[in-house]
Amino acid sequence: MSQLQDSSIRQSDPDSDLDSDSNSNSDLGSLVDQGNAQFEDEYIATEEQTNLEPKVPLSTSIVLDKLPQDQQSQLNHNPYLKSEQKSQSREGTKFRMETVLPKKTTEKNENQHSSASTTKSPEKVTIRFQPIGSTTAIHPKVFKISSVQSILTVNRFLSQKLKNNERQPLHLYIQNSFLPSPDERVGDLYALFATNHELIISYCNTIAFG
């Protein structure tokens, strides 16, 4: 009888071992499940937090990303940056000068051209003939002649008016002071010695001056 009880006890021992192993396995599985659930919760929370962060545009982030005060002061006192700023300012001044100077030069050239055009002799000039001494006077005394004509042409014209022959020379003077050369142009003399918009030419048959 005691032997049967011992065998029943021995036979029941493996069952108890299996139960204990199953219990331990179930406890371990529950711990693993809890760990996985906790990890998933943390991952989801982190992902949601990442998705909720606002995305700042690149241009705005550059503007907002300012340097600290000490680094900003270092940049302000950087000699390289100052020299670069000075060079840029010089280039800007040079550019402004280059853009202004041609305009002033053009205006100056225009003024010179206008002044030259005003002093330029007209196409025809007015000549007043004045006799010296007892030389015969002509009427009328005022004539208009082309500015490109020479003094030699004026001498021939006046000789025809006075009906002088070739043997009787005629001497012309400007402002009763000097004898112009025969090839000088009337327009050049008018530009230099005109009086009241007239070129006064004195004449006589003998040498009167010089």
UniProtKB/Swiss-Prot annotation:
Family annotation (CDD domains): Ubl_ATG12 (cd01612)
A Gene Ontology biological process term: piecemeal microautophagy of the nucleus
Biased composition regions of type Basic and acidic residues, renumbered to the chain: 83-97
Main localization, broad class: membrane
Membrane-protein topology: Peripheral membrane protein
UniProt keyword Protein transport present: yes
GO molecular function, one term: Atg8-family ligase activity
InterPro entries, alphabetized: Atg12, Ubiquitin-like_domsf
Region (Disordered): 1-57, 70-123
Cellular-component GO terms for this entry: Atg12-Atg5-Atg16 complex; autophagosome membrane; phagophore assembly site membrane
Glycyl lysine isopeptide (Gly-Lys) (interchain with K-160 in ATG5), cross-linked positions: 210
Keywords, in A-Z order: Autophagy, Isopeptide bond, Membrane, Protein transport, Transport, Ubl conjugation pathway
Cellular compartments annotated: Preautophagosomal structure membrane
Superkingdom classification of source: Eukaryota
Biased composition (Low complexity): 21-33
Bias kind Polar residues: ranges: 1-11, 47-57
Assembly behavior: Forms a conjugate with ATG5.
Its biological purpose: Ubiquitin-like protein involved in cytoplasm to vacuole transport (Cvt), autophagy vesicles formation, mitophagy, and nucleophagy. Conjugation with ATG5 through a ubiquitin-like conjugating system involving also ATG7 as an E1-like activating enzyme and ATG10 as an E2-like conjugating enzyme, is essential for its function. The ATG12-ATG5 conjugate functions as an E3-like enzyme which is required for lipidation of ATG8 and ATG8 association to the vesicle membranes.
Annotated family: Belongs to the ATG12 family.
Protein name as catalogued: Ubiquitin-like protein ATG12
